[in-house]
Design a protein with these regions (language model features):
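Boundary/linker segments flanking structured domains
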Residues: 1-108, 113-252
Length: 252
């Protein structure tokens, strides 16, 4: 999947992708959420969001999602990384640290989003497990430690969207779409754990017993502050006021 040209989805494949997208999206709308998400979600129906999100998901990722079986750990490990300042959704996989006596190591997968401007995916990768990580990343760091996982995992990209020239230049919309797409894809891949897993298991297109990896994400993104930066605390940047419109100038 690295740098290989892929043919477009057939009409049948596109229909299958849209159908599963709609099913998961409707299920997402039933999840608990903070009040500030109400106004955003009220105008983001599935038929409105589908073309916007679909156009930013690579064909190769779509084929993984509409497959009759979940991706193998090897397939997840092959996902390419986009070293970009665009917003996006990514995977981070890891295994138990050290040697394992027998058999293949269990793969653990975290699906996260990068929605801070400026910075995007490249900054998210740099700071996710840093000492100055945000609270939701601190929870991930604790889980890595408790499970004895290696912190030296590998990143792959599922979705990218530019902060500029997207959604009429509204940075808040880019941020919201990135967070919503993260929730969509972590459910779709069955890469969730904790209470959220029991709430979303019926939305996963494959039998959970067929999935050969363990999801590390346990948070419901709709309970996060849409205005809160995912940039490290020491930067003091990244907070976006709701209702902010217009083109965002790049910093130089």
């Amino acid at each position: 999947m690295r740098g290989v040209g892929l043919r477009a989805l057939s009409p049948e494949e596109e229909q299958a992708f849209e159908s599963q997208f709609s099913t998961i999206w409707e299920g997402m709308m039933a999840l608990e959420r903070k009040p500030e998400w109400e106004g955003i979600i009220s105008r983001l129906r599935s038929d409105v969001c589908f073309p916007l999100i679909s156009s930013h998901i690579p064909v190769g990722i779509k084929r993984i999602l509409i497959s009759s079986h979940p991706p193998t750990p090897a397939k997840l490990k092959s996902l390419a990384w986009s070293n970009t300042t665009d917003a996006g959704v990514f995977t981070w996989w890891t295994e138990v640290g050290g040697k394992q006596e027998s058999g293949e190591k269990t793969v653990y997968v975290y699906v996260g989003s990068a929605s801070n401007h400026p910075g995007g995916l490249i900054f998210r990768k740099r700071y996710m497990l840093s000492r100055s990580a945000e609270p939701h990343d601190e929870a991930l760091k604790r889980k890595i430690k408790d499970l004895g996982l290696s912190p030296k995992g590998q990143f792959g990209t599922l979705f990218t969207v530019p902060f500029e020239n997207s959604f009429e230049g509204d940075v808040l919309d880019v941020r919201a779409f990135s967070i919503l797409t993260r929730l969509l894809l972590m459910i779709w891949l069955g890469a969730v754990g904790g209470e959220l897993k029991s709430k979303t298991k019926d939305l996963v297109p494959w039998k959970l017993g067929k999935i050969q990896y363990i999801g590390l994400a346990t948070d419901n993104p709709l309970l996060t502050d849409i205005n809160k930066s995912d940039e490290p605390k020491r930067s003091g940047k990244g907070r976006v006021k709701e209702g902010t419109k217009g083109r965002v100038k790049r910093r130089v």
